[in-house]
Amino acid sequence: MPECLVTIYWEQRKLSDIADKVTEKNTNLVVQETFTNSAEFGVISQRDFFDHDISNSESIGGYYVVRDEDFVYNPRISVNAPVGPVNRNKLGRNGVMSPLYTVFRTHNIDTTYLEWFFKSNYWHPFMFFNGDSGVRSDRFSIKDAVFFEMPIPTPSIEEQKRIGAYLDRLSNLITLHQRELEKLQKIKKAMLEKMFV
């Protein structure tokens, strides 16, 4: 049988088996930088996303502390994220996020593999079945306890690492080719402009 047709059964684990909800608040205002979670750009500084700070030092005491490699679920619905995005903090520093976000820290799973899982739409049916768009049409509503019941296909840790590394390489290759395409399009445009002057 061709390798591509072999059905592989991976263990299904609940998100709660591999992650814990972060409840650490910024009560002593130790962390001053506020993050946001964008469907397009991932976890980034709020200042970079909005060109200024939305939060202020008086309001961030009740915000959750987001450590390096933590994951963040943003319930804001968009074209790119119909149930809201889940992204990993890869900024290499800590920040804080509004309690509107769900922050979780993983264990016993490769973070790159899990990041790619959340870039897929595999988990969307679970969200649609267990949550709703709520009162506000731009926000998705799901209880934390239900969110952490989400099934995650979990191969061996070695296979997770291979899958994550493969998808990273593929993504980098696509980015490289997109840059080349943009260069060629600029050259073509310049040639057309010179040709018809």
Identify the role of each PLM range.
Residues 1-197:
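Feature detects amphipathic, helix-rich regulatory segments
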